[in-house]
């Protein structure tokens, strides 16, 4: 019985370490995104998104498919650093769905001289070629 318990505890601790490593990678990606945004660097901000025509972004104007179209929308909506402001994310829930997928819920806030903005988001991450990437974003 002790051997079975030891084996189970070993597997559980391995899974917990893996999940922590995955969560750390996702948190780092989001930190990198906010740092890029706060520098006024939308292109670097977009490195967290899957560079693919199947990327899905849902916002107040509806659904946008594709990395390039999403980048264009960001550039159009935030044409300069005063419009971009300073971005902060508050993560409310991180849930590992499988070894390949993570679901994140959180809040975003833009501190701006022209008026602050804030809202909520859900992100679907997929591990692609060993890297966590945002494949779907619903921000409001």
How should these model regions be labeled?
Residues 74, 89-95, 108-110, 120-126:
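Hydrophobic/aromatic beta-strand elements that line small-molecule binding cavities or substrate pockets
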Residues 118-140:
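Short beta-strand edge/turn micro-motifs at domain boundaries
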Residues 9, 14-48:
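Short, low-complexity N-terminal intrinsically disordered segments enriched in polar/charged residues
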């Amino acid at each position: 019985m002790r051997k079975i318990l030891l084996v189970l505890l070993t597997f559980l601790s391995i899974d917990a370490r893996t999940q922590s490593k995955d969560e750390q990678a996702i948190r780092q990606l989001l930190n990198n995104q906010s740092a890029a945004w706060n520098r006024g660097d939308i292109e670097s901000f977009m490195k967290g998104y899957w560079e693919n025509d199947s990327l899905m972004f849902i916002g107040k104007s509806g659904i946008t498919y594709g990395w390039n179209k999403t980048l264009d929308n960001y550039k159009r909506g935030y044409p300069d650093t005063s419009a971009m402001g300073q971005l902060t994310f508050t993560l409310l829930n991180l849930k590992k769905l499988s070894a390949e997928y993570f679901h994140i819920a959180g809040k975003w806030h833009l501190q701006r001289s022209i008026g602050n903005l804030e809202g909520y988001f859900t992100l679907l991450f997929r591990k692609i070629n060993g890297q966590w990437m945002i494949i779907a974003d619903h921000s409001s």
